[in-house]
């Protein structure tokens, strides 16, 4: 039965193209787990939001990315995503430089923060826009741990200057692990199943 389900999905993918509007290797890996064939066509627009709350910023930017790519591929299903980190009401995006990465990691050390991933899935039959939030508790970090991690270069392309999959800084989380990585796989999978079943 599972093989039949996968076969049906592959047949639908031949008819209806699925596009991930992101260059993120982490999002590519997570979407691959859902067993859909897809293309990667990243958005290139400026990532500026007029929203006030971090969770709304993530949704607005995800919406903008998806719509930008959808305009060029109106017969496709397009997924746009954006991930932000919030601590004490303040937004942490990707660090501009190593100094800012250190500031972010120092601020997160020993505290609880939220990771919001906004997702927009666009198809000619409709738009699905949502944000998933995960609470993350950081361990207390020494300056050496922070500087050693920054020296790897890993923080520079990640919201909040860390990746949960490679830092070892997280004590525990409440919510979706995949969401912290940048792609709430379960919710996206539910929506795609609805779209491709029609």
Where are these regions (language model features)?
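N-terminal beta1-alpha1 ligand-phosphate binding loop
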Residues: 17-36
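Anionic-ligand binding patches
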Residues: 18, 53-198
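Cofactor-binding loop segments of dinucleotide-utilizing enzymes, especially the Rossmann-like FAD-
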Residues: 23, 43, 124
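Short loop/helix-cap segments at secondary-structure boundaries that form the rim of catalytic
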Residues: 29-33, 49-50, 71-72
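A short beta-strand-loop structural module common to alpha/beta enzyme folds
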Residues: 38-47
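Short, positively charged and aromatic/hydrophobic N-terminal segments
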Residues: 9-12
């Amino acid at each position: 039965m599972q093989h039949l389900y996968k076969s049906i999905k592959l047949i639908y993918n031949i008819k209806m193209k699925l596009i991930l509007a992101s260059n993120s290797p982490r999002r590519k890996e997570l979407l691959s787990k859902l067993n859909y064939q897809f293309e990667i066509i990243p958005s290139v627009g400026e990532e500026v939001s007029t929203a006030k709350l971090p969770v709304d910023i993530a949704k607005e930017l995800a919406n903008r990315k998806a719509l930008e790519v959808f305009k060029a591929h109106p017969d496709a299903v397009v997924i746009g995503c954006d991930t932000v980190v919030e601590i004490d009401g303040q937004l942490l995006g990707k660090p501009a430089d190593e100094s800012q990465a250190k500031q972010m990691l120092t601020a997160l050390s020993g505290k609880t923060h939220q990771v919001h991933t906004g997702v927009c899935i666009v198809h000619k039959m409709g738009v699905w826009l949502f944000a998933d939030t995960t609470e993350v508790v950081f361990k207390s970090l020494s300056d050496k741990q922070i500087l050693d991690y920054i020296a790897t270069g890993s923080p520079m392309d990640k919201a909040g200057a860390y990746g949960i999959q490679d830092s070892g800084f997280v004590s525990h989380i409440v919510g979706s692990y995949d969401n912290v990585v940048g792609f709430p796989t379960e919710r996206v999978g539910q929506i795609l199943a609805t779209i491709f079943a029609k």
